[in-house]
Amino acid sequence: MLISLLKIMNEFSLHSEIKKAYSLPSDQFEVKLDNYIVDILRGHLAIEVQTKNFSALKEKLQTLTKKYQVRLVYPLPEKKWITQIAKDQTILDKRKSPKKGRLTDLFGELVMIPHMIGVANFSLEVLFIDEEEVRLDDGKGSWRRKGVSIKERKLLKVNDRILFQNSGDYLKILPDNLNEVFTNRELAKLAKISVRTAQQITYCLRKGGVIRLVGKKGRALGFQKI
């Protein structure tokens, strides 16, 4: 009971708002399956909403997919508005972030659970959203934000969604004009992403049994669809 209460207290509004937006009238919420509580139970489908940190679900997903169909729902911010507040909740500034989220950003999280791609009972749905992020300069946040803390994340709008029902669906990530044998650098160039993101993608697809390593292409690793 205490664990459930702490979970609720630590959740951003985004988590509960996604659950509400994603749910159907017949869904059940916060249902116990074995030793776990799942966000939504839709018939025989257990649904987990995770806004970040896929690694926190690793054990839960591995265990539940042995007996149940499990879907992970991930809200990916396409557009973000950043609201800066003072300690008294006064709004100091509000601006639109110049960064626009892309589907390939998913793999920054998926690298934590890449093996799940090849699990038959596992599916993943990405929701492309607009969100508001509320920040407070309290010196307790990430060094990347110079100590600014994220105090709240709010759902503004669900724009679109894409479902990865099986491992083969992940091939849609790869550009159509990619060579039969390709490198991370070639993938990065065609997809207009960083080499680091390309490496995350090929790592996940290899672990999920979607592509394989076929040796070297020049000095770089060469990959091929299975």
Predicted segments, located by residue:
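Acidic-basic catalytic patches of nuclease active cores, encompassing PD-(D/E)XK
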Residues: M1-I37
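Conserved catalytic cores of phosphodiester-cleaving nucleases, focusing on short active-site segments
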Residues: V38-N53, L57, L64
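Long, low-complexity, charged/polar intrinsically disordered regions in eukaryotic proteins
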Residues: K94-Q165
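Short acidic, hydrophobic short linear motifs in intrinsically disordered regions
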Residues: L178-A191
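Short amphipathic alpha-helical interaction segments
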Residues: I193-R206
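Short, cationic-aromatic polyanion-contact patches
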Residues: K216-I226
